[in-house]
Amino acid sequence: MNKNRKINLILIHCSATRVTQDFTVGELEACHLARGFRDIGYHYYITKDGVIYPCRPESEPGAHARHYNAHSIGICYEGGLDANGRPADTRTLAQKAAMRELLKSLCTDYPEAEISRPQRSPRCPQGVSMFRCQEVAFQHPFPHLVSSSHQI
């Protein structure tokens, strides 16, 4: 939990990589360094196998959403594009479970926060609506965040 910044937004991003392509946390780091960032711009990265990699400390602003970095936590999941390069919910069951647990933890730490996807990110799939952490009862289905299982 971060005591130095007021967090009111949790943004869910995708790596905008094809479902058939692996994109490791090392490759994400190299990509962000090549773009001139000092490190990975997200606070957390979730790979296809459901591993949650802490990246940037929550106490530091991210580099994932211009104009929102100062008061947000950025989560990125590996994937987001189908085999043809079109936006799709490509999250594995392991990613969905990991995201659910991470969001439960973040919503405990930041109960006033809203959860959303970047509104100006055509590369990531649609379907993540904005909702408040207080409205989330993680035992129930939330089609806002996921596909066939209808759970985050």
Protein language model annotation of sequence segments:
Residues 61-62, 83:
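Flexible, surface-exposed loop/gating regions in the mature catalytic domains
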Residues 1-11, 15, 48-52, 68-71, ...:
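Basic/polar, cationic surfaces and motifs that engage anionic cell-wall
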Residues 75:
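Ligand-binding face of N-terminal immunoglobulin V-set domains in extracellular IgSF glycoproteins
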Residues 1-60:
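Short, conserved "active-site rim" segments that organize catalytic pockets and cofactor/ligand binding
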